[in-house]
Amino acid sequence: MKIPTETFKSKGIEYIQRFEYNELSRASRNGKRHYETPDGRQVPSVTTVLSATKDMTHLHAWRKRIGVEKAQQITTESANIGTVMHRSLEKHVKGEDRTPGSNLIQQKAHAMANVIIDNGLNDVSEVWGSEVSLYYPELYAGTTDLVGVFKGAPAIMDFKQSRRLKKKEWVEDYFLQLVAYAEAHNKTYDTDIKTGRIFICTQNNEYQTFEIDDYAKWTGKWYAKLEQYYKKIL
């Protein structure tokens, strides 16, 4: 639903409310994240679909190589850093005050957020929404970090933390997330978003970014994953 445009600027960020984004309720089914859409249906999250259809060979090999306890420690620490970094970036986008925090994880996440702000968000000319709940009726839902305009084009944008720099072949799920959110936005709000951008900062403060290079290809792969998921659970 499009609404009358409201614009405000804070700390250099132009926040333009072009659409009425409603937060979706989250639910857990068999331990997997789902969302409740406005029609009352519960649909799987994008990450639930991707997790259920992912080849886990490399992950299992990594856990076996370093040990389950060490792997869990790394996973938990990375998740905590990612959560704090996302919160810091959300505050920046909304023009709220940000502080480095008092513990090492907070300080590291704050520094990583600064890297993304300085290297990636400078090319964002409009922000339409932050932490936006999106859904494709009857199929899936999810939350994207940012919807707005990147280098002149409407875009879905996500923030990621990493322990090291990524190769393109390692981030296929990121592309699938982006097109899933874009397809949901286009369906629900009658838009034509074809641009998606991932902003990454490593825990050593190295910046990296990836953009959807072939929207049709990645959209096809996403719908194939979705079909695989529903065949698996039905």
Which role does the model predict for each range below?
Residues 1-141:
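Metal-dependent nuclease catalytic cores that hydrolyze phosphodiester bonds in DNA/RNA
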Residues 128-232:
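Mg2+/Mn2+-dependent nuclease catalytic core
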Residues 58-65, 226-234:
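Short, surface-exposed secondary-structure junctions/capping segments
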